[in-house]
Amino acid sequence: MTTGSNDFYYSNKYEDDEYEYRHVHVTKDVAKLIPKNRLMSETEWRSLGIQQSPGWIHYMIHGPERHVLLFRRPLPNAQKTVRGGGGTSAVGVR
């Protein structure tokens, strides 16, 4: 758990069989800048001051707590075994 100089809270990482996850709590001022109807690209969330290693994907916003951003990235071994018929694996805004 880390709180940077920007007062963001970074959760510990956790995982399932396919992904590594973490969530980031941003300040109320930054939360106002988050798009309401779509997920952000890595360039967008980095421009808000979120700092993480490459490969993290913003995959969900929890509607009641818009200041909590959820990120995931495939586990190295899971990339070989992920099933699906193409398309995007983005979950979206809830």
Curated annotation (Swiss-Prot):
GO terms for cellular component: cyclin-dependent protein kinase holoenzyme complex; nucleus; SCF ubiquitin ligase complex. It comes from the Eukaryota. InterPro entries: Cyclin-dep_kinase_reg-sub, Cyclin-dep_kinase_reg-sub_sf. Pfam families: CKS. Keywords: Cell cycle, Cell division, Mitosis, Nucleus. GO terms for biological process: cell division; regulation of mitotic cell cycle; regulation of mitotic cell cycle, embryonic. The keyword Glycoprotein does not apply. Disulfide bonds: none annotated. Transmembrane segments: none annotated. Its main location: nucleus. GO terms for molecular function: cyclin-dependent protein serine/threonine kinase activator activity; histone binding; protein kinase binding; ubiquitin binding. It is found in: Nucleus. SMART domains: CKS. Forms a homohexamer that can probably bind six kinase subunits. Interacts with cdk-1. This is Cyclin-dependent kinases regulatory subunit.
